[in-house]
Amino acid sequence: MSVVIVGGHDRMSKQYIDICKKYNCKAKVFTQMETRFRDKIGNPDAVILLTNVVSHKLVLAAKKEADKKQITVIRNHKSTLSSLENVLQQIVAN
C-alpha cells in the first residue's frame, strides 16, 4: 500500500515515513508546494491531508489531482504522529 502525506511539519517528515513503514505503507511526504507537484504524487492508494499546517494552494492541488485519478482523500486536522497513526490504522483495517 502507498500513501501520500500532504502537509505537516518539515522536521517530522522522516517520522511520518517511519510510522508508515510500521504499517507496511510506502509514503511520500510533501510539506510544501514543489514544482511539478502533480507529477510527483503518482498513483497512491490514499492521500492524507494534514490540514492544520498546510497552504490552501497545496491542499487544492492535491485534492484536484486525487479527484482526477480517483484516489481516496483523508483529511486530518492534526499533524501529530498519533493522529497519523490513527488514520493509518483505519486505512489498513479497510
What are these regions (language model features)?
Residues 67-94:
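Ser/Thr/Gly-rich flexible loops in soluble cytosolic domains mediating phosphotransfer, phosphorylation
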Residues 1-24:
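Short, charged N-terminal beta->alpha structural module
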Residues 8-10, 41-43, 90-94:
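Catalytic phosphate/metal-binding cores of nucleic-acid and nucleotide-processing enzymes, i.e., regions
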Residues 52-53:
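Short glycine-/small-residue-rich Rossmann-like dinucleotide-binding loops
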Residues 2, 11, 57, 86-90:
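Long, contiguous binding/interaction regions
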Residues 25-40:
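A short, well-structured beta->alpha microelement
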